Amino acid sequence: RICTAIPLPMCL
C-alpha cells in the first residue's frame, strides 16, 4: 500500500 500526503492525503 502506498500512502501520500501531497497534494492530498490518500492510500492506494
From Swiss-Prot:
It is found in: Secreted. GO terms for cellular component: extracellular region. Its main location: secreted. GO terms for biological process: defense response. Keywords: Amphibian defense peptide, Disulfide bond, Secreted. It comes from the Eukaryota. Expressed by the skin glands. Disulfide bonds join 3-11. Stimulates insulin release from beta cells at a concentration of 100 nM and release of glucagon-like peptide 1 (GLP-1) from enteroendocrine cells at a concentration of 1 uM in vitro. Reduces secretion of interferon gamma from peritoneal cells in a mouse model. Has no inhibitory activity against Gram-positive bacterium B.megaterium Bm11 or Gram-negative bacterium E.coli ATCC 25922 at concentrations of up to 100uM. Has no hemolytic activity against mouse erythrocytes. This is Tigerinin-3O. It comes from Hoplobatrachus occipitalis.
